Amino acid sequence: PSQAASSFSLLQAVSIIRITDPDLRKKVMELSANQPYIEEAAEFWIFCADFNRNHQIAPNVDLEYIEYLLIGTFDAGLMAQNALTAAESMGLGGVYIGGIRLHITELTEVLHLPKHVIPLVGLCIGHPAGEKPGLKPRLPQSMVMFDNQYQPLDEETLATYDQQMREYYQNRPVKAPFTVKRVKGWKDHIEDHLERSKLPFMLEYLNKQGFAKK
């Protein structure tokens, strides 16, 4: 089902690395902030933007334009969401692991990824250990969907949503191993996550893999 996801002009610029080797699982976990789900889950897949296959078919096409990175990233996201939706339809659970990018150069070497392939996100799949937690509250639709033109941030609506998230976090504290501050509400979460998501090596890595040079 995941492979049936929509693909930009059928370029199908995605590959999945299924990690079955226990030693490799442990290594990937260590490179991903030691998130235990990677070792514990029944299945662990890594979704990659992959233009290596297309490059072999059309070797004379210049893939250094950033548009190709956008295409591969978008396609990989669709496929990853389809995979989780299919798993949940069978009574399974899952969690995405964005932390695989924290040491992306070493991960690329461990997975033997060639040029024009980059690992974007991991997905752990398995039977939930306990009762499935409720979905995190989402931003109200008025803040994410606009008619005809972009709308400025509504501070009052944001404050209401932030309070909803404060109540949510009281019952389910943030437990990310690399959280840099105590998260009480959504605004705290944004400040925390943006701060720890700085990966200054990423552009150099992307260039090395043949992406985003133009």
Per-segment meaning from a language model:
Residues Q3-K214:
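Acidic, surface-exposed loops and disordered segments
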